[in-house]
C-alpha cells in the first residue's frame, strides 16, 4: 500500500514511476569515513582600550546650562498673526455701481 501511495505521489510530482522505482530499489551508499582535519589556527584579537572620560558629579551631568537661554527670545505674536503673517489682501475697494443717466 505504501509503494502505491509513493508511486501516486511521485506521478503527481511529475516524476516517472520507473525512475522512482529504480531510485527506491537501490540501497543507499555507505557513508564514507571522514578523516580528522587539522584544527584551524585561532587568532587572538587585542582590544583597544579607550581613555576614560573625566568624571563629573551626577548633578553636573543633569543640569547643563544652555547657552540658548542667554540669547534674546523672539518676540511673541498672537496666533492669528502667526498664521496670516505672509498674506496680504489684494482686494480693491468696491466701485460704486454705474447709475444710468436719466
From Swiss-Prot:
Q: Where is the composition biased (Basic residues)?
A: 80-90
Q: Which UniProt keywords apply?
A: Periplasm, Signal
Q: Which Pfam families does this UniProt record tie to the protein?
A: Asr
Could you tell me where this protein is found in the cell? Periplasm
Propeptide positions: 22-58
Predominant localisation class: periplasm
Any one cellular component term from GO for this entry?
periplasmic space
The UniProt PTM text for this protein says:
Proteolytic processing gives rise to the active protein.
Q: Where is the composition biased (Low complexity)?
A: 22-41, 91-102
Signal sequence interval, chain numbering: 1-21
Q: Which stretches does the entry tag as region Disordered?
A: 22-102
Signal keyword on record:
yes
**What is the purpose of this protein?**
Required for growth and/or survival at acidic conditions.
The family assignment reads:
Belongs to the Asr family.
User: What is the name of the protein in this document?
Assistant: Acid shock protein
Q: What is the lineage of its organism?
A: Bacteria, Pseudomonadati, Pseudomonadota, Gammaproteobacteria, Enterobacterales
Amino acid at each position: 500500500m505504501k509503494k502505491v501511495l509513493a508511486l501516486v505521489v511521485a506521478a503527481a510530482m511529475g516524476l516517472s514511476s520507473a525512475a522512482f522505482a529504480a531510485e527506491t530499489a537501490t540501497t543507499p551508499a555507505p557513508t564514507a569515513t571522514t578523516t580528522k582535519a587539522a584544527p584551524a589556527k585561532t587568532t587572538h584579537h587585542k582590544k583597544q582600550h579607550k581613555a576614560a572620560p573625566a568624571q563629573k558629579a551626577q548633578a553636573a551631568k543633569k543640569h547643563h546650562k544652555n547657552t540658548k537661554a542667554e540669547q534674546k527670545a523672539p518676540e511673541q505674536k498672537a496666533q492669528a498673526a502667526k498664521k496670516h503673517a505672509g498674506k496680504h489682501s489684494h482686494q480693491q475697494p468696491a466701485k460704486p455701481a454705474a447709475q444710468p443717466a436719466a
